[in-house]
Amino acid sequence: MVLSSNWSKLSKTQEKRVKKAEHGKSDGKSDGKTAGVGSRASGTPPETAQRRKSKAKTSKIMEMVAKMNREMANSRQNSAEKNEVQKGALEEKISVDMAQSGKAGKVGSVGKFVAMDCEFVGVGPDGKESVLARVSVVNYYGQEVLDLYVRPKEKVTDWRTWVSGITPAHMKQAVTLEEAQRRVAAMLKNRVLIGHGLHHDLEMLMVSHPKAQIRDTSMHGPFREKYGAGKTPSLKKLAREVLNIDIQGKEHSSVEDARAALLLYKSDKVEFERLHQQRFSRRKA
């Protein structure tokens, strides 16, 4: 192991301090009176045990703070790297899907199918009430066709950046809720809407969509039975179990979540449509 120059300097400095301390002890033993007079004459009082204890405590605290800062920096770096890996895995799945569809490298039209997801921030006391802050829509091939940051009417008390990925800086390019509603409604008109937990997203958008044109991965029977024990499985769990990819490592992205929901639908499209047709044919009867 090769020691750094800083470490070498520190070692030498420590050796000098030890020798100086030993020399001071030797002087004190040989002539205690002289040492005491010298200290008082110089105007520097002898260091008390309490003072030494205080210095040691301060030093220990500083070491702990430095260690915590290093760990936090490493955690942020690891999280950022993990998010990039996850994003790359999802994009690769989308690329493969497009290649199999013969759409690789092409920017297609919106088409009949779209997938949507939203992100929210907190307002009110402690930021517990959710309001819309971003809405993203992708086409059947995972291409982004709409991505809007939405300016909340209320004062944001919790940006939830750690999960939403949204910061105050994003509001510089944000649109009003009314504009977002208008553009999303136009995008969804006469199209099949895919997503995960769409009831909540549509409710927060205050936009309606015909149930016959909704494909919600959170409500898909086979997914609920196999991965949720009859309950609603999370998008994160379905992505891991069905698509073999990890998403939402830390900060969420509505574009990525919309793409994940789209791939989940396409992974079991035949069964999705069979069950959907069965459900709505009963209603008509």
Swiss-Prot record:
Coiled coil: none annotated. Residues 1-11 have a biased composition (Polar residues). It is found in: Nucleus. Transmembrane segments: none annotated. Residues 1-59 are annotated as: Disordered. Signal peptide: none annotated. This is RNA exonuclease 4. The gene is REX4.
